[in-house]
Amino acid sequence: MPKATIIGLGRSGIAAARVLKGDNWEVTLSDRSNSPNLQQTQGQLQQEGITVKLGDSFTLNPEDLPNLIVVSPGVPWDIPVLVEARDQGIDTIGELELAWRYLNGCSWVGITGTNGKTTTTALIAAIFKAAGLNAPACGNIGYAACELALTQQSYDWIIAEISSYQIESSATLSPKIGIWTTFTPDHLERHKTLDNYYQIKASLLSRCRRQIFNGDDPYLHNIGLSQWKDSYWTSVKGKEALLCDPSKGIYLQDNWIVAFGELIAPINLFKMVGEHNQQNLLMAVGAARLADINKDAIAEAMATFSGVPHRLELIRTIAGVDYINDSKATNYDAAQVGLSSVEAPVILIAGGQAKKGDDTEWIKLIKAKVATVLLIGEAASTFAQRLQESDYYAYEIVETMENAVERSASLATDKGVKIVLLSPACASFDQYQSFEHRGDHFRELCLQL
């Protein structure tokens, strides 16, 4: 019986373990944590015949080497034990690659990019569902990919949101349609350089049979003709802005969506705010037309799609003030997009665990649109200093989300502001388990006002 080790006892790791166990592998799950929740999961899995080692930093035992190592998305690909395993010729892959090995009999759409992945993935899944297709979303959204392999259903398509971390560990993953939404500096603490980050993303697209690119993204537009000239391109700026022949373009013209020369639907059917969401929609429409989905299904999904939690999500309106949750804005570019999508003046809640990147354009937009910035988390003092250096002084360090929401309500009344926006420009791990946890807390506090 072949042996497999799974590193990481999260949702992805558990699904991977069950897939392999069901295929007659001897499976061991390893996780450094030893929390009560994991201990409960350990008991459940061990009843299924899966060995679980908690409080365990996986090492290679020369006397008992696994045939396969599967890593969860959060495990760095370059930690010494994984480098050593690959050097020894041990098959070392990510959970998404494992799912691909079991599910490559059906067609995949793979969506990657710095920002916009989740909304684009959700839009594609909604359009494919409206067309009557069995096309679940997975990866960073919806199911863990291996959970789909467990069901043994027959899928028409799989719609996979794929992070750079997952691409690193998925060397043969080759979707039929690949989409690249945006590209800006992010995850450089892991990938070191912008070029490394680009090459990882590009490796996935190069394996896809057809590629769709966001032609309105400055970086992708700049390298487009030199590296991706035979691909499909989108633009919200009209036919003249396309990087390809209009027969391979998806674009807005006179408030209509046009795909490959065909009128699809009027853009006013689509209710999500922001030009960036129109960009996401065009890529989704391109994928749908490449999958031969008709215009009626596209129009139906456009009209009924309400958005994704934590991405410019309207929580409630109190006394004319909109409270908007954009917790997914974990870097400067995403926060800039969020702020540009709402009307001034704004009370902005920002801060958390800072990331590397250029904050210049974000701060310019703050100066133009924000009445007061409320700063929370580890980055509060750093952000305060950056705002001072830019001659912006309308900020307060409030430290916690509870303080921020309470203060935002009084400031909105005092200053006649109609928008309170949580768009942190930071990771969440200083105070929260995830950006979802942070956004859920913001929602809970707003609903208590």
From Swiss-Prot:
Disulphides: none
GO BP of this protein: cell division; cell wall organization; peptidoglycan biosynthetic process; regulation of cell shape
Pathway(s) per entry: Cell wall biogenesis; peptidoglycan biosynthesis
Subcellular location(s) per record: Cytoplasm
Pfam families: Mur_ligase_C, Mur_ligase_M, MurD-like_N
UniProt KW Ligase keyword: yes
Domain of life: Bacteria
Enzyme Commission number(s): 6.3.2.9
Top-level EC class as recorded in UniProt: ligase
Catalytic activity, reaction form: UDP-N-acetyl-alpha-D-muramoyl-L-alanine + D-glutamate + ATP = UDP-N-acetyl-alpha-D-muramoyl-L-alanyl-D-glutamate + ADP + phosphate + H(+)
A GO term for molecular function: UDP-N-acetylmuramoylalanine-D-glutamate ligase activity
UniProt xrefs under InterPro entries: Mur-like_cat_sf, Mur_ligase_C, Mur_ligase_C_dom_sf, Mur_ligase_cen, MurD
GO cellular component: cytoplasm
Protein residues bound to ATP: G113, T114, N115, G116, K117, T118, T119
Keyword tags: ATP-binding, Cell cycle, Cell division, Cell shape, Cell wall biogenesis/degradation, Cytoplasm, Ligase, Nucleotide-binding, Peptidoglycan synthesis
Coiled coil regions, renumbered to chain: none
Protein family (similarity comment): Belongs to the MurCDEF family.
Annotated function: Cell wall formation. Catalyzes the addition of glutamate to the nucleotide precursor UDP-N-acetylmuramoyl-L-alanine (UMA).
Name of the featured protein: UDP-N-acetylmuramoylalanine--D-glutamate ligase
Source species: Gloeothece citriformis (strain PCC 7424)
